[in-house]
A protein has these predicted regions:
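N-terminal secretory signal peptides that target proteins for export/translocation
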Residues: 1-7
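Bacterial N-terminal signal peptides
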Residues: 10-22
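Expand to "…catalyze enediolate/carbanion chemistry for C-C bond making/breaking, isomerization
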Residues: 25-323
Length: 323
């Protein structure tokens, strides 16, 4: 009789667990997009990221740990840190294993700084293999560094697109040059079929159904001079003005930090912000607890921010997506 009671007790506990899990699954958020940062931008909500220019520990364990990170997206630096695609792939696998996020997304968004300078179209095309290998790991976006020339930006957009996507081809773009054979590994990270991945792996908002965010670093005097033309290229979602490198390029090294900036730096920021607004491109700038509300009011929609700053920003804009 005692054994029967134990069996019934175990069965009852198991049923309760199943019911609890079913209720939790039913109540879990149901994201509209794979890319959390993109979904927030679509909602008109600012996006906050974390990451170091010294690089991210590219390992499965670190990815699993970062799956529940406070930030909306992770900036994975390969511009100044080693270009190690295998480590990035392991990190993405860890993120998927540690998910879903509190917002219901399979992973946080990951955007990679790839070590390709947008000097000209030929340079970008010669190094497009880097974009292809990075995208095959399942990341959600790429930043083109030192995006100096509109031809380079155009080549960048074409390099990351599959040729099946035709939006913008009638507006100066050529068809995409990305090959299909990296789709299978990326699809596993996104949790979709290869066909679904190919349909979704495109530049948003150029393609309203796309899930990739393409950004520009307009971070030197050459990019500054061409900012308006660079941002007219279809397919770019966001841009930053890179105050650290910009200050070096403009001859005022160290002026990109906190505090009052020289007039030449203020003018550079204002020009790039205005060009972003004119071309409906989201503007990226760093934020801290003291200035985050003013930055948002000024039009900043993405940026690195501490957990304290993100709490202030999210409450100020009345974000509804769980975090």
């Amino acid at each position: 009789m005692t054994n029967i009671r134990k069996m019934l007790s175990c069965l009852s506990g198991s049923l309760c667990l199943v019911c609890s899990l079913s209720i939790a699954a039913a109540q879990a958020p149901k994201p509209k997009h794979i890319n959390r940062a993109l979904e927030l931008l679509e909602q008109g909500q600012p996006v906050y990221y974390t990451g170091s220019h010294e690089g991210t520990s590219g390992s499965f364990e670190q990815g699993k740990k970062d799956a529940q990170i406070y930030a909306d997206y992770i900036s994975y630096d390969m511009e100044h840190a080693p270009f190690d695609v295998k480590a990035l792939a392991e990190y993405m696998r860890g993120l998927a294993a540690g998910g879903p996020t509190k917002s219901g997304h399979r992973t946080p968004t990951v955007i990679v700084n790839v070590p390709v300078n947008g000097t000209d179209a030929a340079t970008v095309r010669a190094n497009a293999w880097m974009f292809h290998q990075v995208l095959a790991t399942g990341v959600h976006g790429i930043l083109l560094c030192h995006a100096d020339d509109a031809g380079a930006v155009k080549a960048f957009v074409e390099a990351v697109r599959l040729p099946i996507h035709k939006q913008g081809v009638d507006k100066g773009l050529n068809e995409g040059r990305r090959g299909v054979h990296g789709s299978a590994t990326a699809a596993r990270i996104w949790g979709v079929s290869v066909q679904e991945y190919n349909e979704k792996a495109d530049a948003w908002p150029l393609n309203p159904n796309g899930e990739l965010l393409l950004g520009l670093k307009l971070e030197d005097k050459y990019a500054l001079a061409n900012a308006e033309q660079n941002l007219k290229v279809p397919g770019i979602a966001f841009a930053e003005w890179g105050p650290g490198d910009m200050s070096m390029s403009l001859g005022v090294p160290g002026a990109g930090g906190r505090g009052q900036m020289p007039a030449v730096m203020q003018q550079a920021r204002a020009k790039i912000l205005a060009a972003c607004k004119a071309n409906k491109v989201f503007f990226l700038n760093s934020m801290n607890p003291k200035d985050i509300i003013d930055q948002i009011k000024d039009g900043v929609m993405l940026g690195p921010a501490s957990q304290e700053a993100t709490e202030i920003g999210r409450k100020y804009t009345k974000r509804t997506m769980p975090w």
